[in-house]
């Protein structure tokens, strides 16, 4: 056990803070979404930035162009996760960025397959063991989840998708005809109102006295009615104001 810990301590490198950052987004590498990936030109980029480069579609298929030197790196399985990781940076991150593993602290244990294979032995009779199974969610499973229907919509038994556009077209035509007819009627009333005075004079000249008087008096009578209505409204407001004040 001691020799195994000394081996892990000797393999952990000393890295400065600049080497633990992605040179595109300047975020620190981690063991989840921002794993340090090594390109064919030995430049290191986090996995999240590589996914963005692939999604942009500027590079050919199955190829990633290095944003620093334009070197083309082929992806073995047409997936960013198939690119090799920088084991030195991963080891430094797993050790807490202190340049050595946590073997100095007996209360902490680095769970790696290599370490577990040395710990779990027939001679190890202690019952205080904790087994943790960690599985990484595959990237290919997300489109499948997105394609599955989450909500089932109610569809009646008499549902006919062909008749819906026809009914909608008839309804639109009916509403359009109603609106047009109302506008035409309003315009005709306005035209009749403003032409009532010359029309009334013409009827009076033509000796049609009754219709002539009606058309001639239409505009003045409407103006008088509006004036009386406005005057009554003002008087009512003044009366209500006087009643409301103590």
Swiss-Prot record:
GO terms for biological process: protein ubiquitination. GO terms for cellular component: cytoplasm; membrane. The keyword GTP-binding does not apply. It is found in: Membrane; Cytoplasm. A zinc finger (RING-type) spans 22-70. Its EC number is 2.3.2.27. One of its GO terms (molecular function) is zinc ion binding. The keyword Mitochondrion does not apply. SUPFAM superfamilies: RING/U-box. It is an enzyme of class 2 (transferase). SMART domains: RING. Keywords: Cytoplasm, Membrane, Metal-binding, Transferase, Transmembrane, Transmembrane helix, Ubl conjugation pathway, Zinc, Zinc-finger. The chain crosses the membrane at residues 184-204, 211-231. PROSITE patterns: ZF_RING_1 (PS00518), ZF_RING_2 (PS50089). It catalyses: S-ubiquitinyl-[E2 ubiquitin-conjugating enzyme]-L-cysteine + [acceptor protein]-L-lysine = [E2 ubiquitin-conjugating enzyme]-L-cysteine + N(6)-ubiquitinyl-[acceptor protein]-L-lysine. Pathway: Protein modification; protein ubiquitination. InterPro entries: RNF182 (IPR042285), RNF182_RING-HC (IPR047986), Znf_RING (IPR001841), Znf_RING/FYVE/PHD (IPR013083), Znf_RING_CS (IPR017907). It is a multi-pass membrane protein. E3 ubiquitin-protein ligase that mediates the ubiquitination of atp6v0c and targets it to degradation via the ubiquitin-proteasome pathway. Interacts with ATP6V0C. The RING-type zinc finger domain is required for E3 ligase activity. This is E3 ubiquitin-protein ligase RNF182. It comes from Xenopus laevis.
């Amino acid at each position: 056990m001691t020799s195994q810990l000394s081996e892990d301590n000797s393999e952990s490198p000393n890295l400065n803070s600049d080497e633990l950052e992605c040179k595109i987004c300047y975020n620190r590498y981690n063991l989840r979404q921002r794993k340090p990936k090594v390109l064919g030109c030995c430049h290191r980029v986090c996995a999240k930035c590589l996914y963005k480069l692939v999604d942009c579609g500027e590079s050919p298929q199955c190829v990633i162009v290095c944003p620093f030197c334009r070197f083309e790196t082929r992806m073995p399985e047409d997936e960013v996760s198939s690119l090799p990781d920088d084991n030195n940076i991963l080891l430094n991150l797993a050790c807490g960025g202190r340049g050595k593993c946590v073997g100095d602290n007996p209360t902490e244990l680095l769970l790696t397959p290599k370490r577990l294979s040395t710990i779990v032995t027939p001679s190890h009779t202690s019952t205080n063991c904790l087994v943790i199974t960690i599985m990484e969610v595959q990237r290919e499973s997300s489109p499948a989840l997105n394609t599955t229907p989450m909500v089932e919509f109610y569809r009646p038994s008499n549902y006919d998708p062909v008749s819906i556009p026809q009914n909608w077209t008839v309804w639109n035509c009916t509403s359009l005809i109603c609106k047009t007819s109302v506008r035409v009627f309003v315009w005709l009333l306005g035209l009749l109102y403003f032409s009532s005075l010359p029309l009334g004079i013409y009827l009076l000249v033509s000796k049609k006295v009754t219709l002539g008087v009606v058309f001639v008096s239409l505009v003045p009578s409407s103006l008088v009615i509006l004036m009386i209505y406005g005057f009554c409204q003002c008087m009512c407001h003044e009366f209500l104001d006087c009643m409301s004040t103590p």
